[in-house]
Amino acid sequence: GDHRDLHTAYRRQRQMCIRDSYKTEHHTVKGFPGAQDISNEALLELDVDILVPAALQAQITGENASRIKAKVVTELANGPVTPEADPILTQNNVLVVPDILANAGGVTVSYFEWIQNTYGYYWAEEETYEKLEKIMKDAFHRTHEMFKKNEGGITMRMATDMVAVEHVAEAIKVKGWA
């Protein structure tokens, strides 16, 4: 794939529509009209509502976590927030949606495809999206509830793990294995 934009950061006060033909024509967002070239470090530290690190690991570290101004960090890359940064962000009231939760959509849709292929089902695209939205929202709400229930003592990542363990334990009980 084309990785030219991995180390490129741009800021634009107004909405920046990357679906624009510019990316297609130039194969990069570099030089996007009206966008200001900034460092990746500056991008991470912008005063924004939601920050979505989506390309590289270890972007938010123990060193820069205290400078993150976003209210929410949604990890679309694998491991963009380091273990050292996670508690710092939580302490600073930055809600981190961990990669294992934020990235679960792709695996979930793969499961839907498996179900359809195995049992000969066909779901329209809209129905697939509705099922995915329900599962993702439920997973987020269960995780966030676990986080709030243990407020101050755990991170959202820990809450995600705790919900997963609870889910497995419940499945073991239902199957009569325990």
Where are these regions (language model features)?
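Single conserved hydrophobic/aromatic residue that forms the stacking wall/gate
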Residues: 1-14, 18
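Preference for short coil/turn "hinge" residues that link or interrupt alpha-helices
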Residues: 3, 31, 36-39, 53, ...
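Short acidic-aromatic active-site loops that bind/stabilize oxyanions
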Residues: 7, 41, 54, 132-133
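Generic structural signal for beta-strand residues in well-ordered domains
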Residues: 7-9, 44, 66
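General structural signal for secondary-structure boundaries
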Residues: 11-15, 39, 61, 82-83, ...
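Alpha-helix C-terminal capping/helix-to-coil transition sites in glycosyltransferase folds
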Residues: 13, 46-47, 69
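A structured beta-alpha segment of the ubiquitous adenosine-cofactor-binding alpha/beta core
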Residues: 19-64
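Adenosine-phosphate binding glycine-rich loop
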Residues: 66-178
